[in-house]
């Protein structure tokens, strides 16, 4: 599903925003891009929003096959699932992007936006294939997956990457839920304190936010709005940001 956002600029060549879980957030995000692309407070140019739909989020967005729960425990009767993120990445780049660029006036600048499992996929794509997109917006990424396997993998490969010219906005819902045991909060701190500094050393521009009034199920839209606002604020040139 495609929608051309309105605004000033070259109507023939536009940036493309790939929105994972597009069936949930498509219309809202189209509204956000139309607002910012026509606002004097933003440098966001008119862009094309591509809603990316899938039939199995666990399979498509997770890096490993795992039975571990959100608190890190494993029950013997839970069946392992997931592990198809790299296959889905190849579909996204080798098939979907080619189809999009054959149908719409794209200019070669691309954004990837994801929440939850899709936020984890967004971070993994940045870590493994930073050249694939120009800006990444990862909302409350499911770092707990497979007992924090993403952080383990990222710690090994970020040293080999160059993130020059790339931008990451990452946000976490930090409202406490006492009845639920999670390893997510400690992993989010590890991302901030260990992985992100190494990515910055490799020239990645990072904006890290916490939303203390939001939980996992409510953070997506306010954080996507804030991500677009923060990355494209009119007083900041994203080409010069460090």
Question: What role is predicted for each listed range?
Answer:
Residues 1-12:
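Single conserved hydrophobic/aromatic residue that forms the stacking wall/gate
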Residues 16-91, 95, 99, 103:
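Serine-hydrolase catalytic machinery in alpha/beta-hydrolase-like enzymes
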Residues 19-25, 101, 126-127, 135-141, ...:
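Cell-envelope and extracellular/periplasmic
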Residues 33, 119-130:
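Short glycine-enriched nucleophile-adjacent loop
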Residues 52-53, 113-115, 139-140, 171:
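Alpha/beta-hydrolase-fold catalytic nucleophile elbow
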Residues 104-116, 136:
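Alpha/beta-hydrolase fold nucleophile elbow
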Residues 128-165:
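Mobile cap/lid helix-loop segments that gate and shape the active-site cleft of serine hydrolases
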Residues 171, 176-179, 185-192, 196-242:
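C-terminal catalytic histidine-bearing segment of alpha/beta-hydrolase fold enzymes
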């Amino acid at each position: 599903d495609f929608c051309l956002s309105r605004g000033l600029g070259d109507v023939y060549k536009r940036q493309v925003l790939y929105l994972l879980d597009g069936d949930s957030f498509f219309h809202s995000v189209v509204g956000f891009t139309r607002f910012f692309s026509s606002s004097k407070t933003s440098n966001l140019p008119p862009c094309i929003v591509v809603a990316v739909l899938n039939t199995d989020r666990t399979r498509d967005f997770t890096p490993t096959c795992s039975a571990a729960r959100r608190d890190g425990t494993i029950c013997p009767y839970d069946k392992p699932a997931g592990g198809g993120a790299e296959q889905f990445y190849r579909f996204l780049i080798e098939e979907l992007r080619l189809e999009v660029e054959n149908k719409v006036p794209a200019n070669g600048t691309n954004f990837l936006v994801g929440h939850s499992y899709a936020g984890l996929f967004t971070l993994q794509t940045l870590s493994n294939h930073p050249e694939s997109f120009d800006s990444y917006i990862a909302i409350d990424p499911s770092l707990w997956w497979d007992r924090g396997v993403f952080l383990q993998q990222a710690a090994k490969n970020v040293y080999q990457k160059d993130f020059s010219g790339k931008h990451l906005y990452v946000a976490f819902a930090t409202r406490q839920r006492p009845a639920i045991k999670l390893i997510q909060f400690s992993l989010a701190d590890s991302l901030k304190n260990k992985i992100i500094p190494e990515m910055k050393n490799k020239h990645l521009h990072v904006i890290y936010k916490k939303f203390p009034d939001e939980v996992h199920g409510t953070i997506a839209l306010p954080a996507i709005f804030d991500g677009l606002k923060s990355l494209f604020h009119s007083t900041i040139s994203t080409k010069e940001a460090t």
